[in-house]
Amino acid sequence: MAKRDYYEVLGVNRDASDNEIKKAYRKLAMKHHPDRNPDNKDSEDHFKEAKNAYEILSDAQKRAAYDRYGHAGVDPSAGAGPGGQGFDGFADAFSDIFGDIFGGAGGAGRGRSNVYRGADLRYNLEISLEEAARGADKTIRIPTVEECETCHGSGAKPGTQPKPCPTCGGAGQVRIQQGFFSIQQTCPKCHGTGRIIPDPCRDCGGAGRVKRQKTLEVKIPAGIDEGMRLRHAGHGEPGVNGGPPGDLYVEIHIRAHPVFQRDHDDLHCEMPISITTAALGGEIEIPTLEGMARLKIPAETQSGKVFRLRGKGIRNVRSQAHGDLMCHVVVETPVNLTERQKELLREFEEVSSSDADRHNPKAKSWMDKVKDFFGA
């Protein structure tokens, strides 16, 4: 499984200060510490992941290498490119062995250009329910890194050039002898680039890249739901040594709506009606995303009744089908009554008491169940 971005692991921005990184790590460490979560494998994995991220981002040199090269700049096992060593690294090790024994060229990885794909970026975008339903065009500004215009990405002061790394001779990897085995690892001095920069560029500090704010237009498709991600290929961080750029993933979050609650393509809303309308029936106005609509309420409607308005929900993001609007009836008990209103209600109670079972069937059914329960 590919490693997660260390900034994402700690939940901080790429331009976070050392103090912000430390606070984020402490919070995660306390939450997932093994002493607090015994026998919890997920918490143990989260704890280790946060610890690894903090070890890199809390060290200025390692952080600079990570910002420039991603995991490949700080993890020797990533020297074979994104995703770690994999089968190719295994084959390289045996190639080195047979090369040493038989005097062959060996080291299939020697002289590699150390080209790396740029890191992916993630942006959380909050939109309204109406925008999610109808679609929208949004403009976002994302923090990213771009090639330094002063040194054109070389990292060296104008008029100077990077030099071959004296440790690896420019190969980007070093050979380590372990008994009969000869293996290769990413050079710890140049972090796999095969070069060092004696006179760093003043504008980028030798990184070859600088932090920037990038403006991007994002098209939100109609019907998009909470947590869905929009991929913008090539809008991540630039690659290293001519490698392809990463991608930008825009994750959608929908603000809570004062009237509607969403359930996939369906919408739900509460519909308060008066006792009179519930008892006698009537016609009321209800809100939809397209405007107000009229709904007939039949007589003797009870609280909790659900009316379905077909096609008044949200269009499915992958088809033209629409969800429904579910209106949940809430019969309101009148408040702040005048004396005359109270008198009329008491009068209604008196004239209804002689035939209460017929007028209140649910109450009778409930009382019958209570009597059966107590054996009355």
UniProtKB/Swiss-Prot annotation:
It is found in: Cytoplasm. Pfam families: DnaJ (PF00226), DnaJ_C (PF01556), DnaJ_CXXCXGXG (PF00684). GO terms for cellular component: cytoplasm. Keywords: Chaperone, Cytoplasm, DNA replication, Metal-binding, Repeat, Stress response, Zinc, Zinc-finger. SUPFAM superfamilies: Chaperone J-domain (SSF46565), DnaJ/Hsp40 cysteine-rich domain (SSF57938), HSP40/DnaJ peptide-binding domain (SSF49493). Its cofactor is Zn(2+). The keyword Chaperone applies. Zn(2+) 2 binds at residues 165, 168, 187, 190. CXXCXGXG motif repeats lie at residues 148-155, 165-172, 187-194, 201-208. Zn(2+) 1 binds at residues 148, 151, 201, 204. InterPro entries: DnaJ, DnaJ_C, DnaJ_domain, DnaJ_domain_CS, HSP40/DnaJ_pept-bd, HSP_DnaJ_Cys-rich_dom, HSP_DnaJ_Cys-rich_dom_sf, J_dom_sf. GO terms for biological process: chaperone cofactor-dependent protein refolding; DNA replication; protein refolding; response to heat. A zinc finger (CR-type) spans 135-213. Belongs to the DnaJ family. Participates actively in the response to hyperosmotic and heat shock by preventing the aggregation of stress-denatured proteins and by disaggregating proteins, also in an autonomous, DnaK-independent fashion. Unfolded proteins bind initially to DnaJ; upon interaction with the DnaJ-bound protein, DnaK hydrolyzes its bound ATP, resulting in the formation of a stable complex. GrpE releases ADP from DnaK; ATP binding to DnaK triggers the release of the substrate protein, thus completing the reaction cycle. The J domain is necessary and sufficient to stimulate DnaK ATPase activity. Zinc center 1 plays an important role in the autonomous, DnaK-independent chaperone activity of DnaJ. Zinc center 2 is essential for interaction with DnaK and for DnaJ activity. This is Chaperone protein DnaJ 2. It comes from Aromatoleum aromaticum (strain DSM 19018 / LMG 30748 / EbN1). The gene is dnaJ2.
